[in-house]
Design a protein with these regions (language model features):
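Catalytic core of pol beta-like nucleotidyltransferases
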Residues: 1-53, 63-69, 79-119
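Glycine-rich beta-strand-to-loop/alpha-helix junction loops that act as flexible
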Residues: 57-60
Length: 119
């Protein structure tokens, strides 16, 4: 049995790998665009329905090179009444079924989370 790969076979393999890498990159760009649109909708909703004062996106959705299939949308919120938190999260999760939203109340966030938000 001959297990050697010819240069032609190797080029076919490499071309396929390049094509898959390009498709993955395009998919992540689209995911980031959708995530940013959902973030805008979320900010409007939080301000309008819950009186939030400020909303900031942070985390992997901001950086294409860190974005992956399981990336969620991390939002920091100021001025949300703690009693409204779960109701707000429920509304945010209904904005797009493919984008999970992680809502962080800045006033009660742990220091290491605040550091990430500030970056």
């Amino acid at each position: 049995m001959n297990y050697q790969i010819t240069p032609e076979q190797m080029e076919i393999y490499r071309a396929g790998a390049r094509r898959r890498r390009q498709q993955e990159q395009e998919r992540m760009v689209k995911k980031q665009q959708i995530g940013c649109q959902v973030a805008k909708e979320a900010a409007e909703l939080l301000k309008r329905e819950f009186g939030a004062q400020k909303i900031v996106i942070f985390g992997s959705m901001l950086k294409l090179e860190k974005l992956h299939d399981r990336s969620d949308l991390d939002l920091a919120v100021w001025g949300l009444n703690p009693r409204d938190y779960y109701r707000a999260v429920g509304k945010l999760l209904s904005l797009d079924p493919d984008i999970l939203v992680d809502l962080v109340e800045v006033e009660s966030a742990k220091p290491h989370i605040l550091k990430v938000i500030e970056e």
